[in-house]
Amino acid sequence: MGSAPIPIIPVATTCVNVSDYSRGLLRKHGITFLGGLDLGMTALGHALRWLENRGRVRAPAPRRVTAPGEAAAAAGPWSEVGARRLLAEAGVPVVPGGLARSADEAVEIAFRVGLPVALKICSAQITHKSDIGGVVLGLGSEAEVRGGYEKVRAAGQAVPEATVDGVLVTPMRTGGTELLAGVTVDPAFGPVLAVGLGGIWVEVLNDTSLRLLPVDAAEVRRMLGELRGLPLLQGARGTAPASLDAVAGAIAALGEAALALDGTLRALEVNPLWVNGDQVEALDVLVITEAREQQ
């Protein structure tokens, strides 16, 4: 069987012990033995998926992204302004907004991007903004924006180790579906892309698909197809069907942004990636880098 022109893998119908002698004899002739139908079919399924993925491996795409100055700075989290700049340069749609350093600037930006708005403290040293009161949502008037700015700014200044860049002003987004798209670096395999339902659904459903980078938009489409939450993107419960091509393109571009930080990336996460019909926007962005290893 080991020299047969097609693969032959014996699978026992019941899970039984096989002696070392029997296993050695089978291995000598290039034969793999799987005990039990459940274990055997699972192993064969994994082997086929590995074969399919191996056939999709491509040479890395040309890097379109130049890592901004933050990549050369001290290791740790980036200011969200720098993280947004990285994604925008890679071609990831980012929710419009601006950095305000005064209440007047916050009001000007709010009316430019459209009320109601969200305000977030912007500091590389403050990653969990909500925990310190550094986020206010749904501000719909000039007075609310001014009050929100002062509140958020004060929350940031109350963190002794934080350098506050300003207050990020962005429009509120409602409806649609929230996704998570992020990249972490595995010590053995390198950068790994995770895609799943975002927002409140991340911990509830634990519904994610993983790939090693690089990926293209076609591969991201396959990742989306693996999600149990795919019906939400297809218009379930009265939501507008999402443009899966637009979603896939944005996530593939996020992968390019991660690859631009080769050698320094620890984590890059967008949660949520807001999707509403053909609109796709990164609402919250986190980038963490580390010092480049000396060669």
How would you name each of these model-derived features?
Residues 1-295:
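ATP-dependent carboxylate/acyl-activation modules
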